Amino acid sequence: MKEVTLNNGVKMPQLGYGVYQVEPAEAKRCVSDALAVGYRMVDTAQAYANEEGVGQAVKESGIPRSEVFIVSKIWISNFGYERAKQSIDDSLRRLQTEYIDLMLLHQPFCDYYGAYRALEEAYREGKLRAIGVSNFQPNHFIDLASNVEIVPAVNQVETHVFCQQRRAQQYMNEFGTLTMSWGPLAEGRNGFFTNAELIAIGQNHNKSAAQVALRYLTQRDVIIIPKSVNRDRMEQNFNIYDFELTPEEMARIEALDLGKSLFFDHNDPETVKMFMGWR
């Protein structure tokens, strides 16, 4: 398993298992399967309502806690210093762990400065091994990173072959912040799994379109967390380090970039209004 080094020296797997939209009742089974396949990083969030299942699976796996990298996120209803501080303790309890390896702020809305101060404090106390943000576009990210004491280790943003975030990644690199992809398979949108270019490149390596797309991101030094509730698909998503895309193949995939989200634009006022309704 390839590891990446965060800006505070902490190492984390480049490939992990995501549990977005995994039902709480299914989370334990899915994470147990993922750990059995070989995954050693699990990405959850307060808003997913499945932290308990993740914690149970890790605890009952028999794998030392130090060998499983847990990522979670604070939801905007818990932003502000005091609420974020309490929510970190709540996540620790639900995950049945004394520390969380990486804790992120889930969205760039509400009092994220107050919430980030709570992250910094919990980091210094040893409750969090690393801290970061999620869905922060370059304007939000640069503003925050320039005005906090601990620069985010990671920014988790929509990143896949149709929304490649190359410019955003350059800005984050200037701060030593790594890009982490949510939706690395774009939830199958825009004909993802039947894309002729991805299929053709996959045939060169006896790999699927999904495996090619995931490998493309890892070769660009992006952290990925593909999600599947099917163990066979978990295994396919895991087996992406036994081949290398050529520079020519990388360029062909780069040309697939649409330069826009397939989900929502965090700079769109209507998107902000939507999230305000989820507080």
Write out the residue ranges for each language-model feature.
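Beta/alpha (TIM)-barrel catalytic core signal, keyed to glycine-rich beta->alpha loops juxtaposed to Asp/Glu
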Residues: 107-279
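N-terminal binding-site loop/beta-alpha segment at the start of enzyme catalytic domains
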Residues: 1-68, 185, 277-279
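Residues at the N-termini of beta-strands
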Residues: 41, 99-102, 130, 154
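Acidic (Asp/Glu)-rich catalytic clusters
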Residues: 7, 55-65, 89-96, 121-123, ...
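Short, acidic/polar
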Residues: 22-34, 80-94, 114, 139-141, ...
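Acidic-and-aromatic substrate-binding clefts and catalytic sites of carbohydrate-active enzymes
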Residues: 22-25, 44-53, 77-82, 108-113, ...
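Alpha-helical scaffolding within the catalytic cores
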Residues: 1-4, 52-59, 88-90, 138-141, ...
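Glycine/small-residue-rich loop that forms an oxyanion/phosphate-binding "nest" at active or ligand-binding sites
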Residues: 77-116, 120-121
